[in-house]
Amino acid sequence: MDLKGLIRDIPNFPKPGIVFRDITTLLSDAEGLRYTIDTLTEKCKAANLSPDYIVGMESRGFLFGVPLAYQLNAGFVPVRKPGKLPAAVHQVEYELEYGTDSLEIHQDALNNHHNVLIVDDLMATGGTAKATADLLEKIGCNVLGFAFIIELKALEGRKKLPNLPIISLVDY
């Protein structure tokens, strides 16, 4: 199936010179959505990735992470931006091109030695994925790898995620 054909390009969004890869058209296509989840599942199994939990990155990682967790018989845990989780959290701060940001996870969501797979819709520079992995490793999790729908190859995000399996379905 041509997943790239189901992803809409929006030029000059969110700012001039950027081409936004809009997955809402993929999500609204029942066959494409099923194919996406089935293919992620197959690739995880082929790579012998058996997570206890799927960790979905805010917010589109939730859309693909929950059905993947179901398919892999794993739990699902969200990683969110600050102030979005109601209970006590672990937090990590990370560098952006012009400043810093942070991510949070509930303190009681995961324990030491849980095997986790990090899922998001898109990998660009790899900064947020790396920060998520750092947060999970800080609390004692074993990060098995990453799964993305889209990878923007020119931004070389893989360089920030060495020595871990990375699954991506569509390259730009």
UniProtKB/Swiss-Prot annotation:
Listed EC numbers: 2.4.2.7
GO molecular function: adenine binding; adenine phosphoribosyltransferase activity; AMP binding
Keyword field: Cytoplasm, Glycosyltransferase, Purine salvage, Transferase
Cellular component annotations (GO), alphabetically ordered: cytoplasm
Protein's cellular compartments: Cytoplasm
Keyword Zinc (UniProt): no
Gene Ontology BP annotations: adenine salvage; AMP salvage; purine ribonucleoside salvage
Catalytic activity: AMP + diphosphate = 5-phospho-alpha-D-ribose 1-diphosphate + adenine
Enzyme class: transferase
Listed pathway(s): Purine metabolism; AMP biosynthesis via salvage pathway; AMP from adenine: step 1/1
Subunit relationships: Homodimer.
Similarity-based family: Belongs to the purine/pyrimidine phosphoribosyltransferase family.
The protein's role, per its UniProt record: Catalyzes a salvage reaction resulting in the formation of AMP, that is energically less costly than de novo synthesis.
PANTHER family: ADENINE PHOSPHORIBOSYLTRANSFERASE
Name of the protein described by the UniProt record: Adenine phosphoribosyltransferase
Lineage, highest ranks first: Bacteria, Bacillati, Cyanobacteriota, Cyanophyceae, Oscillatoriophycideae
Gene name, Swiss-Prot/TrEMBL: apt
